[in-house]
Amino acid sequence: MGHLIPQTGDEETELGLAAVRLANCAAFPMVFKAAIELGVIDTLYLAARDDVTGSSSFLTPSEIAIRLPTKPSNPEAPALLDRILRLLASYSMVKCQIIDGNRVYKAEPICRYFLKDNVDEELGTLASQLIVTLDTVFLNTWGELKNVVLEGGVAFGRANGGLKLFDYISKDERLSKLFNRTGFSVAVLKKILQVYSGFEGVNVLVDVGGGVGDTLGFVTSKYPNIKGINFDLTCALTQAPSYPNVEHVAGDMFVDVPKGDAILLKRILHDWTDEDCEKILKNCWKALPENGKVIVMEVVTPDEADNRDVISNIAFDMDLLMLTQLSGGKERSRAEYVAMAANSGFPRCNFVCSAYHLWVIELTKQA
């Protein structure tokens, strides 16, 4: 029996179908999150990776069920997995074939970006970021967006008893561990180190807001002559492992910043208001020599919203994430970064290169 595809043909029908899809848009991310947490994505990825002949990569829902890290006690699990997987297949996350009247599934290449346990060390994973984004704590925050528009305030605080995001995370060990694992950092950093040569000649590199220090770990592994100072709040450093040539230093970037030849701000400025960013940058200015520089790594929003451009989608998605999670946090345009740099004492703001969705921006004291 073939696919039952409704005849569209006219513009009104196409628009109506697009509207119906939008009305049901919550289903895909929540189902995908469950598939990651269950280990379905890892299971399919491993089957495809270990299949030399290409003949056994496709698995039935029953075969997937028995390979999951936690074996289901529910006898209906294979049928439920089938329903989950056919939705993922409709979004091109997995491949689906029908063999002997039964659906079988295989991982698509994009699955390697969403592994939970068998993470590709050359790539990193976005699984934790997706899980955090769809955590109840953050879902409740989205429910306050309308009220923020009408009445003001901060969505995260309104939904979480007035607490700020980073205060909340410091008190929630589960969320803190997930938060520190989030993102696509490995792949992005590897790409940046391929295309950006600005770390050459740096002797002391300070990573302000460096978290657990993984960014400096990557940089110093390529540039072993660099002494790295990983600078963050005490609570952020509690889970920080040891890295060669990296010293963990606790402090507050709004008070002062350790001295270095160069200062790195990776995904820090988007957390704060323009006024707070200028305070941070002025402290960086004080900590740098005359020929020093700040290396900013951030999303840069395009001036126009283009529905055909995935970078626009990512930039504006992240901007709304900042709006709901933080007080005054936002993604910024080129013009906004140039103005912010000038207001903080940096006459030169150079957009050097990009890697995936992040730009590398150099701010220097000398024009």
From Swiss-Prot:
Gene3D superfamilies: Vaccinia Virus protein VP39, Winged helix-like DNA-binding domain superfamily/Winged helix DNA-binding domain. Its EC number is 2.1.1.-. GO terms for molecular function: O-methyltransferase activity; protein dimerization activity. Keywords: Methyltransferase, S-adenosyl-L-methionine, Transferase. It is an enzyme of class 2 (transferase). The active site is at H270. S-adenosyl-L-homocysteine binds at G209, D232, D252, M253, K266. Pathway: Secondary metabolite biosynthesis. Signal peptide: none annotated. GO terms for biological process: indole glucosinolate biosynthetic process; methylation. Involved in indole glucosinolate biosynthesis. Catalyzes methoxylation reactions of the glucosinolate indole ring. Converts the hydroxy intermediates 4-hydroxy-indol-3-yl-methylglucosinolate (4OH-I3M) and 1-hydroxy-indol-3-yl-methylglucosinolate (1OH-I3M) to 4-methoxy-indol-3-yl-methylglucosinolate (4MO-I3M) and 1-methoxy-indol-3-yl-methylglucosinolate, respectively. PANTHER family: O-METHYLTRANSFERASE. Belongs to the class I-like SAM-binding methyltransferase superfamily. Cation-independent O-methyltransferase family. This is Indole glucosinolate O-methyltransferase 5. The gene is IGMT5.
